[in-house]
Amino acid sequence: MSGALNAFTIKGGFDFTMDMRRKDRHITQPDRIVSIIDGCSVCRIAMQDGEGLYIVPLSFGYEYSGVDNIKLYFHSANEGRKLRAITARPDVAFEMDCMEGITQGDTACAYSCAYKSITGTARASIVCDTEEKQRALSLIMEHTVKKHFDFNSEQAAHVAIIRLDVKSISAKGSD
């Protein structure tokens, strides 16, 4: 990928340069990154609390208005370990991937996975604004089931919405 970016500068001047061994698999084009996000149905959030490391897979929705402005949204119960961890330590990591199949070979070591993946870091927050919660719920449903739903304020009040403001992102794939 000659001429491709090796790093993204994300909000706040954060540079993320992945020292990736397989440079031929590093995906840096914003449109391809968005395509990978579109193809993933689950995002895992990794966080830490007083009990230790914690990772949880969640369905999600997102807003993209440039590689330096990606917001991932998740819904949750209004209480629990995840919310306590985010409140205590809002810096988190995330991962999503799309397995596209198995590449077969003549020997066991020649087999491989065809995949695309995204990893990154983010600042997590609990959304309190009712309109943003309603929009986030709609985004989650649009991404998950490819259908638009509207939510009223009462429905939004019954769930917690977690927003990840992406600070760094890296994509990789086996094209």
PLM features: what roles do these ranges have?
Residues 36-37, 85-86, 140:
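A generic structural signal for nonpolar/aromatic side chains embedded in well-ordered alpha-helices
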Residues 75-76, 81-104:
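Helix-adjacent hinge/juxtasegments
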Residues 40-78:
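Short beta-strand segments
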Residues 7-38:
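Extreme N-terminal tail/first-helix region
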Residues 41-43, 54-56, 68-70, 88-92, ...:
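A generic structural signal for short beta-strands and their flanking turns/coil linkers
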Residues 27-28, 39-44, 144-147:
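Short Pro/Gly-enriched beta-strand edge/turn motifs at strand-loop
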Residues 14, 19-24, 99-175:
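Charged, gly/pro-rich active-site loop segments
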